[in-house]
């Protein structure tokens, strides 16, 4: 991370090239890259921009998914949206832009690691989106988002995460609850056991799965619920 100073002309030109937009008001880009720990005056950091950028990103990603997955239901679209606007995805975009070279922070933040540092990188991406939106308008912001998210949206189609993760995100978004898994039965000999597991989400019918391990049975139950609710397409018979 850089020290608390404005971008050099060379760094600004390099970053604007990666963004695909030359800022009319250069101060907006500086503010988008300034963490609260490095601010010198009220309103000079990215916190307000982050608030706006989160909404602009959500709108553009929702529109992208709506147009890309024409047969997907609301549940599936919500899961995809949550994945694409997550801190993990935003931090990955930050890494692609090498934003760690430009973010301005105080000394205490430079010591952060792991998830907390990932959240800082993700926040800066959202503030950057807001700065682009304010400087160039929605179309320019959309162009930037498509540049770095469209490929991720398409790749996500063939690379769904495990069923338990998908079900948890959907149930949080839809009902505000976490799925509950219960082992109903363990049968068979020790060398070849069978586990029957039920998954429950408040407000809808439960589903069960039977497999040779508890985790595998949970995955089967979660998959059946995702398919029944239209979040995932149902697997062909025999698969």
Swiss-Prot record:
Cofactor(s) this protein requires: Mg(2+)
GO BP field: mRNA processing; regulation of gene expression; rRNA processing; tRNA processing
Any one Gene Ontology cellular component term annotated for this protein: cytoplasm
Domain of life: Bacteria
Keywords: Cytoplasm, Endonuclease, Hydrolase, Magnesium, Metal-binding, mRNA processing, Nuclease, RNA-binding, rRNA processing, rRNA-binding, tRNA processing
Localization per Swiss-Prot or TrEMBL: Cytoplasm
A molecular-function term among this protein's GO annotations: metal ion binding
Residues involved in Mg(2+) binding: 50, 123, 126
Residues annotated as catalytic: 54, 126
Pfam families assigned: dsrm, Ribonucleas_3_3
First-level EC class: hydrolase
Domain DRBM, first and last residues per copy: 162-231
InterPro entries the UniProt entry points to: dsRBD_dom, RNase_III, RNase_III_dom, RNase_III_sf
Catalysed reaction, written as an equation: Endonucleolytic cleavage to 5'-phosphomonoester
Known partners and oligomeric status: Homodimer.
UniProt family annotation: Belongs to the ribonuclease III family.
The protein's role, per its UniProt record: Digests double-stranded RNA. Involved in the processing of primary rRNA transcript to yield the immediate precursors to the large and small rRNAs (23S and 16S). Processes some mRNAs, and tRNAs when they are encoded in the rRNA operon. Processes pre-crRNA and tracrRNA of type II CRISPR loci if present in the organism.
HAMAP family: RNase_III
Full protein name: Ribonuclease 3
């Amino acid at each position: 991370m850089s020290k608390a100073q404005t971008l050099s002309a060379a760094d600004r030109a390099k970053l604007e090239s990666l963004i695909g937009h030359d800022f009319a008001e250069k101060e907006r880009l500086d503010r988008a890259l300034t963490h609260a720990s490095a601010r010198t005056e009220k309103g000079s950091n990215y916190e307000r921009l982050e608030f706006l950028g989160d909404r602009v990103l959500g709108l553009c990603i929702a529109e992208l998914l709506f147009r890309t997955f024409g047969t997907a239901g609301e549940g599936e679209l919500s899961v995809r949206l949550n994945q694409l606007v997550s801190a993990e995805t935003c931090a990955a975009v930050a890494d692609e832009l090498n934003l760690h070279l430009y973010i301005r922070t105080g000394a205490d933040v430079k010591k952060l690691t792991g998830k907390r540092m990932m959240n800082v990188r993700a926040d800066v991406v959202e503030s950057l989106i807001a700065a682009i939106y304010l400087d160039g308008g929605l179309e320019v912001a959309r162009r930037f988002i498509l540049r770095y998210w469209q490929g991720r949206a398409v790749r996500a189609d063939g690379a769904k995460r495990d069923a338990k993760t998908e079900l948890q995100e959907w149930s949080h978004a839809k009902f505000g609850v976490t799925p509950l898994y219960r082992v109903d039965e363990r049968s068979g000999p020790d060398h070849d056991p069978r586990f029957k597991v039920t998954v429950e989400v408040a407000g809808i019918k439960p589903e069960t799965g039977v497999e040779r391990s508890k985790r595998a049975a949970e995955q089967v139950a979660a998959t059946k619920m995702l398919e029944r609710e239209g979040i995932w397409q149902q697997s062909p018979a025999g698969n």
